[in-house]
Amino acid sequence: MNIHEYQAKALLAQYGVGIPRGGVAETPAEATVIAQRLGGEIWAIKAQIHAGGRGKAGGVKLAKTPEEAGEIAKAMLGSRLITHQTSLEGKEVHKVYVEEGLGIEREYYLGIVLDRSLEMPVIMASRQGGVDIEEVAKNSPNEIIKVAVDPMIGFRPFHGRKLAFALGLAKEQVGLFVDFCTSLFRLYVQKDAEIVEINPLVFTSCKRFVALDAKISFDNNALYRHPEIVAMRDLSEEESSEIEAGEYNLNYVKLQGNVGCMVNGAGLAMATMDIIKHEGGEPANFLDVGGGAKPETVAKGFEIILKDPNVKAIFVNIFGGIVRCDRVANGILEAAKIVHVSVPVVVRLDGTNAKEAKEILEQANIPNIFAAPSLEGGAKKAVELACQGGAS
């Protein structure tokens, strides 16, 4: 689960992490009042959306008067911001964050993520702050410093000092930096975060480290332990189809392609998307229906996929382990009666009773449902049908 920058900074403040003073505005008048209250000579006006790259897209601007802050907020509020992390439609701006300007001496990057290969959290830092860390990793990988933290030991001052020395911090900065990292890691662990990212982390003219921007994402599976985090959820930032899928225990993520995918198991779902791309197509979604693949579940999956007007064909890829393929085949036919499936459906079933399942689909003789002989053949057929605009 993602939260907004202003919410992330409120959490950081609770853990003693330095942040600039600021306030949230939903109207231009509120933005003007907040700037007046903060005082100073310059303010940053930041669009609040769940996506990075706001600065390049015009979602972060500076104002030199409170009145200008209101004018900038007026232009941002209600507009749609398109960044490299949004869809082509972008995200509508409902709130802006008005923040005091700071005297900045140096910018850094600091982040905490789980390294699955090491099976432990890793703190990453870089002297190249304020830029896209993915670009730094691609173009200057040596500029990223990584320190793994054994969860059996936890974060210790020596971890912070190792990062500080690698960043070339001055002697008087090291202790401040270690304290900053200690607080950040405590938040990461106690709130069950997946990512805590400060970009940029700045050292100010007042000689302190401050989180100038912040991104925090949380583990959905741990949200039951954090009702205070759940209360921060902004449904307007999420795809309505993804919210609906969650209500039926379906894992759905909307993508930009035209081949709908319905698969059981997250690993198989990712492999299915890969083979669709390998065959020259583009997946329209990630959809994991789980282990059951019951008629109601399949029907709801079809319904959600077909809400995307870009979908021109659907590839159903089910591996029958515990669930029998013949039951899945009957479930697909029952689902087709419940939901009007307006595009061709290619079905690949493998595993327990796969032969019987293929016979069931072939005997049903439904014009737009095709039994695929293999994973490769199914993906190729789905891509071909999608390229034909769904014509079977």
UniProtKB/Swiss-Prot annotation:
Entries under Pfam families matching the protein: ATP-grasp_2, Ligase_CoA
Coiled coil: none
Molecular function as annotated in GO: ATP binding; magnesium ion binding; succinate-CoA ligase (ADP-forming) activity; succinate-CoA ligase (GDP-forming) activity
Domain ATP-grasp: 9-244
Cofactor(s) essential for the protein: Mg(2+)
Residues binding substrate, per UniProt: 264, 321-323
Keyword Coiled coil on entry: no
Reaction(s) catalysed (UniProt annotation): succinate + ATP + CoA = succinyl-CoA + ADP + phosphate; GTP + succinate + CoA = succinyl-CoA + GDP + phosphate
Binding-site residues, ATP: 46, 53-55, 99, 102, 107
EC top class, as a word: ligase
Amino-acid positions noted as binding Mg(2+) in the UniProt annotation, renumbered to this chain: 199, 213
Listed GO CC annotations: cytosol; succinate-CoA ligase complex
Assigned keywords, A-Z: ATP-binding, Ligase, Magnesium, Metal-binding, Nucleotide-binding, Tricarboxylic acid cycle
Superkingdom, natural source: Bacteria
Matches recorded under InterPro entries: ATP-grasp, ATP-grasp_succ-CoA_synth-type, ATP_grasp_subdomain_1, Succ-CoA_synthase_bsu_CS, SUCC_ACL_C, Succ_CoA_ligase-like_bsu, Succinyl-CoA_synth-like
GO BP field: succinyl-CoA metabolic process; tricarboxylic acid cycle
Pathway: Carbohydrate metabolism; tricarboxylic acid cycle; succinate from succinyl-CoA (ligase route): step 1/1
Enzyme Commission number(s) from the entry: 6.2.1.5
Keyword Membrane applies: no
Bound cofactor: record note: Binds 1 Mg(2+) ion per subunit.
Family of the protein in this entry: Belongs to the succinate/malate CoA ligase beta subunit family.
Oligomer status and interactors: Heterotetramer of two alpha and two beta subunits.
Function summary: Succinyl-CoA synthetase functions in the citric acid cycle (TCA), coupling the hydrolysis of succinyl-CoA to the synthesis of either ATP or GTP and thus represents the only step of substrate-level phosphorylation in the TCA. The beta subunit provides nucleotide specificity of the enzyme and binds the substrate succinate, while the binding sites for coenzyme A and phosphate are found in the alpha subunit.
Name this polypeptide is given: Succinate--CoA ligase [ADP-forming] subunit beta
Species name: Wolinella succinogenes (strain ATCC 29543 / DSM 1740 / CCUG 13145 / JCM 31913 / LMG 7466 / NCTC 11488 / FDC 602W)
Name of the gene: sucC
